[in-house]
Amino acid sequence: MRDLMNQVPVSDRLDRLVADSLNQLRAEQKRKRRQKLFAAAGGAAAVFACAFIFLNVNPALAVRLPVIGELFDKIEETISYKGDYSDHSNILLPEKEINKLEAGEIVDSPYVQISNGITVAVSEVTYSGQAVYLAMTIHNEAAFPKSFYENSVSEEIGYQTLYLECPERNSGDSCLMRVEGCFKDEYTFIGILRHDTTGFIRGDGSGVSGINYFLKIDAIRGEGPEGEAAAIPRYEGEWNFKVHGELDMNQIRTVKVDAVGVDGFRIKGLIRTPYEIYAEVEAPEGRDAKRCFTVICDANGNRLPLQAETSENYSTYQRDVSKVSVFVCDYEEYMGKLEQGYSAVSNEKTYAQYLSGYALVSAEVTFEAE
């Protein structure tokens, strides 16, 4: 049936509307899950702060890991933050060590650690300047409970999720980091962790080209029964990783925009990485930048999907971003009216045309051919 449906011709506009609707569904479901999980964790701090802490790396012995090599290539198209990560990945575990792990042999590596019967292996990394992406295998000797894989996926979303509890650097509270991927069986989960680093690369092209990323995991948890946060299974342990990510600055494209709206909101510039695009927005004095929402549309006027929940990074995966349109809207107006209102005019206007009459400030930017 799915193959037959894929053969039915549909317009690009309808195809894009369906994709945008599914992206919205994913975002709503993730927000609900985050609320449930944060309640269970006793209140969490900002996700982007929790992993940049100094750790001692203690290599551990590993059990047999059935799927560990080339994880980016296997799952980069199935998760919500899609990207060509395999084209830019830094391999942490060489093929020789991967073969040993898959054969059940002992590997002494800082990227493979076991605690309380759960092995965590970090096999690949890529750093875009806007985020760090880690390819991970998580293996439980005793098998994960059914709730981990039965409650964490739907046909609409198409991927599964595990959550990592990590200590927040300043407060000591736990924060939750989401790993998206799939369960290969009841014992093994493979996925990609995305950690936001917005601000590390600036619109003038300056920034951090290399990063030492520290990840300390105190517990691993999955999904529990709907509405029963206290029943979410949780595995405590100690997994500490230090990973270096290197960025080829030639992959970063920046454009100075300096567009100012009537209310004083300013689009300073655009930053485009191999995976995402981000607009630097500045609020006028006395106004809160958090009260506005930035939308970026591709060269065809279609809205780009958000790459993350915690920042306004937009995915460029398989989209034409040689030219983009940027719109800064009032947050409440966009969330309460504009986002839902587009469906009424979608047959007449692109998303860019629709937003042009509502934006506090907007700009059209063309990236020069490389």
Model-derived regions: residue spans:
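Long, compositionally biased, charged low-complexity segments
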Residues: 25-38, 334, 347, 351-354
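Disordered, charged N-terminal biogenesis/targeting segments of membrane/secreted proteins
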Residues: 1-35
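Alpha-helical, hydrophobic structural elements that either
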Residues: 18, 53-370
